[in-house]
Amino acid sequence: MARVYSNWDRLVRATLRREQLRNTGQGHERVSSGLAGAVPPSLGRATNIDAILQAADEIQSEDPSVARILCEQAYSMAQNLDPNSDGRGVLQFKTGLMSVIKQKLAKRDGASIDRDRDIERLWEFYKLYKRRHRVDDIQKEEQKWRESGTTFSSNVGEILKMRKVFATLRALIEVLEVLSRDADPNGVGRSIRDELGRIKKADATLSAELTPYNIVPLEAQSMTNAIGVFPEVRGAVQAIRYTEHFPRLPVDFEISGQRDADMFDLLEYIFGFQRDNVRNQREHLVLTLSNAQSQLSIPGQNDPKIDENAVNEVFLKVLDNYIKWCKYLRIRVVYNKLEAIDRDRKLFLVSLYFLIWGEAANVRFLPECICYIFHNMAKELDAKLDHGEAVRADSCLTGTDTGSVSFLERIICPIYETISAETVRNNGGKAAHSEWRNYDDFNEYFWTPACFELSWPMKTESRFLSKPKGRKRTAKSSFVEHRTYLHLFRSFIRLWIFMFIMFQSLTIIAFRNEHLNIETFKILLSAGPTYAIMNFIECLLDVVLMYGAYSMARGMAISRLVIRFLWWGLGSAFVVYYYVKVLDERNKPNQNEFFFHLYILVLGCYAAVRLIFGLLVKLPACHALSEMSDQSFFQFFKWIYQERYFVGRGLFENLSDYCRYVAFWLVVLASKFTFAYFLQIKPLVKPTNTIIHLPPFQYSWHDIVSKSNDHALTIVSLWAPVLAIYLMDIHIWYTLLSAIIGGVMGAKARLGEIRTIEMVHKRFESFPEAFAQNLVSPVVKRVPLGQHASQDGQDMNKAYAAMFSPFWNEIIKSLREEDYLSNREMDLLSIPSNTGSLRLVQWPLFLLCSKILVAIDLAMECKETQEVLWRQICDDEYMAYAVQECYYSVEKILNSMVNDEGRRWVERIFLEISNSIEQGSLAITLNLKKLQLVVSRFTALTGLLIRNETPDLAKGAAKAMFDFYEVVTHDLLSHDLREQLDTWNILARARNEGRLFSRIAWPRDPEIIEQVKRLHLLLTVKDAAANVPKNLEARRRLEFFTNSLFMDMPQARPVAEMVPFSVFTPYYSETVLYSSSELRSENEDGISILFYLQKIFPDEWENFLERIGRSESTGDADLQASSTDALELRFWVSYRGQTLARTVRGMMYYRRALMLQSFLERRGLGVDDASLTNMPRGFESSIEARAQADLKFTYVVSCQIYGQQKQQKKPEATDIGLLLQRYEALRVAFIHSEDVGNGDGGSGGKKEFYSKLVKADIHGKDEEIYSIKLPGDPKLGEGKPENQNHAIVFTRGEAIQTIDMNQDNYLEEAIKMRNLLEEFHGKHGIRRPTILGVREHVFTGSVSSLAWFMSNQETSFVTLGQRVLAYPLKVRMHYGHPDVFDRIFHITRGGISKASRVINISEDIYAGFNSTLRQGNITHHEYIQVGKGRDVGLNQIALFEGKVAGGNGEQVLSRDVYRIGQLFDFFRMMSFYFTTVGFYVCTMMTVLTVYVFLYGRVYLAFSGADRAISRVAKLSGNTALDAALNAQFLVQIGIFTAVPMVMGFILELGLLKAIFSFITMQFQLCSVFFTFSLGTRTHYFGRTILHGGAKYRATGRGFVVQHIKFADNYRLYSRSHFVKAFEVALLLIIYIAYGYTDGGASSFVLLTISSWFLVISWLFAPYIFNPSGFEWQKTVEDFEDWVSWLMYKGGVGVKGELSWESWWEEEQAHIQTLRGRILETILSLRFFMFQYGIVYKLDLTRKNTSLALYGYSWVVLVVIVFLFKLFWYSPRKSSNILLALRFLQGVASITFIALIVVAIAMTDLSIPDMFACVLGFIPTGWALLSLAITWKQVLRVLGLWETVREFGRIYDAAMGMLIFSPIALLSWFPFISTFQSRLLFNQAFSRGLEISIILAGNRANVET
């Protein structure tokens, strides 16, 4: 039985430890040991069981009996909490805990236990533990430090030990308190309770150290956190403290923690804010105030005060949007004047705003709603503050008898519930936008005075809070996002009017043969009616597209619509009428031209008035004047001219910026219209006139339109492609000019000056000074430079180097930690501190390597004078540095080693050498040919000194020193000097007695140790360091960092005075860390992630093994054997993927940089701990440096479902916990949900949601800091914005950088963050920046060609593209995640993204729109960069581009784009259009040009018009058509996409490398890739606008080198590319077959080469760029898989990946609405043209053009369909029916074949006719299939759906076979696969990587 009991105990312990190991990431870090790590969540939340068990583990070795007492108490607490063990894991925990207790009892060897004495034993141990750890002394010292106003003098390691001691003491006190209740009340129990009472009063330190806090310990003072004693923080705390004139709080109101009451307590009592919200915003305000104060000045230590200016700055910035809102609505703010309210009132208002915002949840997306709430609550507060006693607010009373208040329940919940009810109508994103109110609709309700109808408290029956009932929709506010392309016309009406009028004018001039006379002028005046009619169309669209908002829209807005509609309706009629009269006058001779003059007068007056208003409203210089005018007449016309919104006012720039972007566009437009006139319009004039005057001819088919209308369709087919290119090619000119401007600006900004590691070597000498000028704060520069101000430049350079060295070395260390460098490279790259007594600058060894040896060779070969030798050495300046350093270092080292006679010898030697140098007789004094021997003896000495001292080494060093002495004396010195030394009595006596150099002083001084090691390397490293570092990434980073030192950037301020900021990363469920199993799990080719990375990054793998102390032969099993090494391996792999771990590491470099900067600043000022100054990593141990960094930097990762992941024990939760342990400053916010009772005591009912913030405690477990209840599920929109929104309340500072979880950062870039933040105070136009754009480096482009294309394309946009957008165009928005936001500006204006479902799918760009509309300013800066990962496989890239294109499709419908398009001035509007949605419109136009051209050509071929007119009109060689097609082709293949790319290459790589890179890209088929991407963007953009369906597409960010199956590619690209490519191919075939040209088929091919290229790219790009796409074995497997998928029957629950039927149904899901069905029907009608045209081209029909022929073709088609159905039909019942069916099928087939044979033999039907019929019937069948899919419900009712589905299967099978056949054919030839591998992975081959091993797979290696 004992054995069973023992085994059970072992099993339970092992299970608990394994569970704990899994929950702590199978690694080290700070892990909760023992049972404390296995406490179930249900027990841990309610008690301190885990803390008690942790204390038991801590003291187990000191006193097992006390540990047993603690365990027993923990068991009792668990039993009391959950007696039935109902909670998850509780039973296992209790069993394990009881097992531990029994083991502890068993170890007592049978000794009895007197439990009555447990409390006494515990009490004695408590006192002993306090004495042992000097707790009382520590508390006394802490009190002294606090009284002196400084922090406790201790480093981080000691602080952690102290906190653990305090935690243990607190657990002991808690157990003592519980046990004392059961003790003898008259005995020891009473005395202990009395003692405990005294302890709890006096021992505030215990609770202070263990009270959870975020950054500042406000609840209780902490001795381990220095932030609380910073004077600015103390001043801020003092500023909000409760004063006598505040209303008195009730006596029973509980003040949390050990602090004094403050104004937040009063606000909590009055309005019922949540306690944790109050705690959170209290810290928020304290940090905001303290940072505002620090930027003005640091207060004094004694009684610090916050300056009034700091309070005013915070007040005005926080309430800026509220003040503007009041001004817009013409209501009075809650205070009279700023000067009239005192400081406390200001802080009360700011505190109130923060508290409202902090608890508003989803209502934070409604900034003006928050203004409304604040306005009313501030008025309530104002009244309450006048009372002597605090009184609760009526608006927040919950209605219960207790008189309790709840802001959340009374104010936020009603609004949230209304929003939530509206989102239900969204139907998961499928409903039309017009069917429901989104966030913008709710917010814009508060843009009108009607919002005050809500009253206060808000009326629940108001229209605003009305919830949708049934199918009745609630009205929108002021804009309705109807799904239509017409939004493009409406939003950018001025652009389209301008383009069409210019086209009309140029066409008129061309047709008038450029005769600019009065007649031409009269015709040009036709632009007047065009202008009026287009404006009338806009007004008509305004009226139509406002449908759905009339009942809620402002009356003024509707009035403006009506007025404009009537104005333009009557105006267009008037202008058209008068212009017709002008034309009548023109045609009648002898007219007085009355109407012409009147017409001119009307147009002139209108143009003048319009110009004046345009100047006043849009021109920067006149805008202020128009704003000041209060004339009602003027304001009326201004209102008619431009709608007035709360946003979008003041969208103008200063005059200089305005002139710049106007000049830019004038150049673009001049180029565009010159090209359009001479190469597009003018060449078409003659052919058009020829066609119009062409005599009638016989059409080949039954013509309906052209014959009687001057060949109208022929002219349309001629002009349509040219018009399409005309509308698109302005983007080409924009791209060209922006590339040129961007390149010039980049060169001016000094980008690319240092582009190779050789240039880093050459210019290294200038780096320290540049670094000191830009990146060192003036405070630090003043101290060292002041000391050397009177000295020479050498001392200045040394001072600069001393500033530079700690930063450079830390950068090098970070590169080593990231395994980009080896240990040797780190030593070579490190720079000495330059703070020693050496008289010259010491440079890194990689600059000096082998220089000494070369100098020795020069000296040994020198036959000239000393001056000549020195000149030769100085030709290489670093050689001169090396020689000088070697000389002075040898002198210093020798003097430090020897004494007495030895020192005298050293001094004499160096004195003689110095004298010789001064006299120029060095070559006489020394025998330079012996230098090599001398150096060899000295390196022997230093080789010993660099090791740790031992007796043997000491003897060896003494001998080596003597050998050195002998060589110097007898070989190096001249004969005369040698004789002098030999006869020197003191020296001779010591030598003879054996005392000379008998004792060597081993180096102890850190400076000497550093010099010895450095000198040894300097003398022994023989190979040149030109290739140091050899890692390409390390080179790139060092090149960019050193280059950025010479770029313009603001001056860095001291850390204490810098702008504080937060970094914010949203995370859902992506990879955090790769698990050990994921590292080794193999794909179908036997490739694991670890194997892949070892081959791709071989040098980094070797560096990693070196770092962890392993040899290169170490295997995976060896690494797994060590938990530490296994964890390091997981991190190493994760840091090379797109993981959260990589992002967190990168962002935490900010803290490391700030700690280093703060530490060095404090050390420079002499205020830091002297004991840490000489520590290698002293800044990391400095408590003050850490506190200063935490005051200025916060990092919050918003892990939306972290709570669920923890409950489900997902590995992601474990890994996030591991990151929390590794980075103490990391904070994780997440949404926690709890099931609450339904009111009758049962479980279930509804859920409550909480926004929580956690950090790691001292034991590595999650410690909850804040828990704020939400009104409901926050995910009402897109998800990601709400994830950001719930967590943004936990951010701090004045700036916030948004970082996605696929990004990275680097220490050298983090050092420049202070400079970047100063840009917020810089001058960038008339407004200060609100978003700082940051350059990105795409780190995923290093291996495959696709990744390289994508990274180059992305890099060109995020550098050159955004450079031009920000300046001079002033239209940069927020495109990605490294941008830095003005935090206060944005959190008071709706946040950093928008969240409405579907319409805000591209949520981040709306932050830029919102910032711009609210008078923000967005800049771009390139001296700092952030790493970014991108998708690397074609499928991932296609999904990503589809997501972005779909998002742009939704933007077309959005109100933000509409308002920017309407409110920007004309030129800025064009910049905005062509850089946002216009880019996708032009992309779509490129594809449409192909369609328009080919359909036009096919029309000409079918109709016979081409043959009739080709000789006279010469269409095939027409200049305009050629120009149009050439422009289309160049856009299609990505030439203009590559232009900015090439310019970026030239700028940053150099001209030759740029040319080589561009040619390489072409050889790697980048044009195929860009053409394919063109189709992706066109498909998703167009389909989104037509049908919607834009959604977030998870692209996956793994390592992609695996083969994608044929079926996977077919599913993804079938409808977006393949169908369209086959349509274009069919058009081309028909064009070749029936078109007419003198040159034959070859001319057709040449004319349509771009179209053929498009077909091939769209059909085969997925397979060309598919790894192993042409390997025969994989081709066979792909075919089998595809056939299996195609024939697999679908059903309920069967996914599209498994069955063609399921996939086919999914592909039709986007067709939802009647409008969509009608549009699809219209688009499908084009396919009927093929059959209609081919029928009349058959030999059978000859020249018959009767319409009946087309009818007969339909009869044939019906017969074919019937036969198909007959052959496809398969009965499932009787075998007799089956036999009859087979007989019928046989007869039918024979009959059909016989009829065809007879028809061919007896009629004119030919074999080519048969193929022609196939060409005609295939598109008709596709049209019928498309129509059937569109009207699916009708077909289902008719019972034809099964037949339709089988037709669909046949079409997909046929398309698949046509694509697959060439692939199968090419797979026969092995060299094709080899060529493809080189094509795809050229980057890897050029780096010498073993990519072939990866592609071949690792199966063979595994099997053998």
From Swiss-Prot:
E.C. no: 2.4.1.34
Coiled coil: none
Main localization category: membrane
Annotated disulfide bonds: none
Repeat among keywords: yes
SMART domains found in the cross-reference section: FKS1_dom1
A Pfam family assignment: Glucan_synthase
GO molecular function: 1,3-beta-D-glucan synthase activity
InterPro entries noted in UniProt: FKS1-like_dom1 (IPR026899), Glyco_trans_48_dom (IPR003440)
Localization annotation: Cell membrane
Family stated for the protein in its record: Belongs to the glycosyltransferase 48 family.
Descriptive protein name: Callose synthase 10
Gene giving rise to this polypeptide: CALS10
